[in-house]
UniProtKB/Swiss-Prot annotation:
Pfam families in the cross-refs: Ferritin (PF00210)
Protein name: Nutrient stress-induced DNA-binding protein
Record Gene3D superfamilies: 1.20.1260.10
Superkingdom per UniProt: Bacteria
Amino acid sequence: MADTQTLLQNFGQVYDNPVLLDRSVTAPVTEGLNVLLASFQALYLQYQKHHFVVEGAEFYSLHEFFNSSYNEVQDHVHEIGERLNGLGGVPAASFSKLAELTCFEQESDGVYSSRKMVENDLAAEQAIINVIRRQAAQAESLGDRGTRYLYEKILLKTEERAYHLAHFLAKDSLTLGFVQPAQN
């Protein structure tokens, strides 16, 4: 017996939705949701890799931070995917589509210093913050208050991770004394 696949809805195609938002609203909103979904998927993989490979004096605190961050980011992906589907859209899922839609420069494969990993994560979070702010304003202007509210909840968590990453990069650190000569 031959295996057949029947495509029910193309990516980018938006169907009617049970929350009664017009397609003129949901089409641009679902497009923005997919940019964030892709970006959080890429960030999830980056945080997960950092969790696996981090070493050095800050190992334990960074190891735990990367773990909690990739779990939070995974939750964002879930919420965004559910919202996309609820609005009649199709969540991006192929690696090629996710890479195309991601809003930040993805870190190349390899292992980097702890500082560089944190810098890359902060740059990614900041790029995502900018997209969330734009998309929240767009959703509000189109009358999609539910998506705007979802964006605002995610924005607060994303900003909090950015604060923590910036704190890891602070110049005042016990470990700097181990690797830099004392200045008298």
